[in-house]
């Protein structure tokens, strides 16, 4: 926990100037608060006894001024602390988002999207509440606590000793409850993350849910998660509800002892009635902050639990990093060479078993094989989305591990099977391939991708909103925009991962024409399901269980009569049956 406080403070450090000003405001506001009981003591001790009207008027005005100044200082304190909290949260969100952009693909494959989203939203929001509200309260109540204690010592040090009786008990109680509150708060954040994950998953699959008529099933699933969250929330609420009364009871014992012993002192003439009343007001001032601090302490445990979840993400190892002496890869010609490459997703189970291949600049290398044969893994290894266990991958003689990831991926364009577009306009999505591109270049890329015609027919042309993940477009339209985006990037190396397999025959023909334009003059790796799209490939590689079992041109492999030939015959037969 100490480490969490320390790390959280590292985000506050840049705003130390404002924090000091906020603390000064807190001190002055608390000082005004502490001044009022002293004025009341003066009323009882001097004004009522001496019937001093001038002093009464002065004290009355002083009380008004004290509360006015208290309000001014409280405003400054709350505004400054809110500013600090908001800036810290911006910095934390930026840090975690920056980290997420650098984490390996495998990190996201092992976690639900909603859980990752919850780190950036729910956990950071819990941290914000802790900083903006409860840190302010902790500062204010601590100042009142210390100030009241100091005034009590000045008034009657023997009576003050009675208040110290409860300090060890309060400290022990808050320590016990604090540990349990942190644990339940951590569970609460996990349950909220579970709800976010389920919600994200259900909304993404709403068509599937409707098609299988599983609305009631999903409602039941959500209800169970909601109930689990309720149970976690109530466990935390139970502890919070218990903490304040326990601390308040201990404080009441102290006040009763003060009243009993202080009353005897007044009766014996060792203490004035005004001093006792002032002392009791300060004692109440002492007990109230202790009671409020117990609640604040519990809420801060929630913020710390959320912070630890966030810091766990920030501490996640970046498995794929640039070498200390990594160089920027220059513009390449496109020679890609894999030598005895081995790779495994799970330790001890090789997904790629010593593969070697070479693509000359401008060549088209097609990779075919059954599902799970390792085709897409090869596509992920070339841009270094994963690191190989042994062997080497070289581009124009540069080992891809010896150059920066950014300079490597700038040379590679990828058109995946599942097209990913962003919520925005057609123009913005194509421009994503090159943020510095001109309007003329964007239109030219769209024309090359056979997309300009349908874009021009849209209500707002290139400024048409396409919806989340391009939901307002057809599959073929989405794919052509993705191709236009790749054309605009103008990479020397292309990876097409079954780019047309999900399209109907008509859409496939249009998209294939666009792909043919895209492939000209570029080294390309085409992962294909439909063999008709790779007939013109310079080399066709057939994979099976992570190994290359055949390689050659289309005609050579047909003549060989092996796996490729059988796949081709099967697809030809299916095509004839469809016709």
Regions found by a protein language model. Name each.
Residues 1, 24-25, 32-41, 45, ...:
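Juxtamembrane helix-loop junctions of ABC transporter transmembrane domains
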Residues 2-16, 116:
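A short amphipathic helical element positioned immediately N-terminal to and/or at the very start
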Residues 13, 24, 32, 36, ...:
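Hydrophobic alpha-helical transmembrane segments of ABC transporter permease domains
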Residues 19-73, 80, 153-158, 256, ...:
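Transmembrane helix-loop-helix hairpins at lipid-water interfaces of multipass membrane proteins
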Residues 51-54, 151-165, 235-308, 313-314:
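Helix-loop-helix
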Residues 105-106, 124-131, 135, 139, ...:
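An intracellular "coupling" helix at the cytosolic face of ABC transporter transmembrane type-1 domains
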Residues 315, 322, 329-579:
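ABC-type nucleotide-binding domain
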């Amino acid at each position: 926990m100490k480490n969490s406080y320390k790390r959280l403070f590292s985000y506050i450090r840049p705003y130390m100037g404002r924090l000091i000003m906020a603390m000064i405001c807190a001190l002055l506001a608390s000082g005004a608060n502490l001044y009022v009981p002293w004025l009341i003591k003066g009323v009882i001790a001097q004004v009522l006894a001496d019937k001093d009207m001038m002093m009464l008027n002065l004290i009355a005005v002083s009380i008004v001024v004290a509360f006015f100044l208290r309000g001014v200082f409280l405003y400054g304190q709350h505004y400054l602390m809110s500013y600090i909290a908001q800036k810290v949260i911006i910095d934390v969100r930026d840090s975690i988002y920056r980290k997420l952009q650098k984490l390996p693909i495998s990190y996201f494959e092992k976690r639900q999207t909603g859980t990752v989203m919850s780190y950036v939203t729910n956990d950071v929001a819990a941290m914000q509440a802790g900083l903006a509200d409860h840190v302010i309260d902790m500062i204010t109540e601590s100042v009142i606590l210390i100030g009241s204690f100091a005034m009590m010592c000045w008034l009657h040090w023997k009576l003050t000793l009675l208040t110290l009786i409860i300090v060890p008990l309060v400290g022990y109680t808050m320590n016990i409850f604090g540990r349990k509150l942190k644990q339940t708060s951590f569970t609460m954040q996990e349950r909220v993350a579970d709800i976010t994950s389920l919600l994200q998953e259900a909304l993404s699959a709403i068509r599937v849910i409707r098609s299988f008529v599983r609305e009631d099933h999903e409602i039941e699933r959500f209800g169970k998660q909601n109930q689990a969250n309720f149970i976690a929330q109530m466990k935390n609420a139970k502890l919070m509800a218990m903490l304040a009364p326990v601390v308040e009871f201990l404080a009441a014992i102290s006040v009763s002892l003060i009243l009993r012993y202080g009353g005897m002192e007044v009766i014996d003439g060792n203490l004035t009635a005004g001093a006792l009343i002032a002392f009791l007001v300060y004692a109440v001032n002492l007990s109230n902050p202790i009671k409020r601090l117990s609640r604040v302490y519990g809420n801060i445990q929630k913020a710390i639990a959320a912070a630890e979840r966030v810091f766990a993400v920030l501490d996640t190892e970046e498995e794929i990093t640039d070498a200390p002496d990594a160089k920027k890869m220059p513009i390449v010609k496109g020679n890609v060479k894999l030598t005895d490459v081995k790779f495994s997703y799970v330790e001890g189970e090789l997904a790629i078993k010593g593969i070697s291949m070479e693509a000359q600049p401008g060549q088209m290398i097609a990779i075919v094989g059954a599902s799970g044969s390792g085709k897409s893994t090869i596509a992920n290894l070339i841009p270094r989305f994963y690191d190989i266990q042994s062997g080497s991958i070289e581009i124009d003689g540069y080992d891809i591990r010896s150059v920066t990831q950014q300079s490597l991926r700038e040379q590679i364009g990828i058109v995946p099977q599942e097209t990913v577009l962003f919520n925005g306009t057609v123009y913005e999505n194509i421009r994503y391939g090159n943020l510095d591109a001109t309007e003329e270049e964007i239109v030219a890329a769209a024309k090359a991708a056979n997309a300009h015609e349908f874009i021009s027919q849209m209500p707002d042309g290139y400024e048409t909103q396409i919806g989340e993940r391009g939901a307002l477009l057809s599959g073929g339209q989405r794919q052509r925009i993705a191709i236009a985006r790749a054309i605009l990037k103008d990479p020397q190396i292309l990876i097409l991962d079954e780019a047309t397999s999900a399209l109907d025959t008509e859409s496939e023909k249009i998209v294939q024409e666009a792909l043919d334009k895209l492939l000209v003059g570029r080294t390309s790796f085409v992962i294909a399901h439909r063999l008709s799209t790779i007939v013109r490939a310079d080399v066709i590689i057939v994979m099976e269980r992570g190994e290359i079992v055949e390689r050659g041109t289309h005609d050579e492999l047909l003549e060989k009569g092996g796996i490729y030939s059988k796949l081709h015959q099967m697809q030809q037969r299916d095509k004839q049956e469809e016709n």
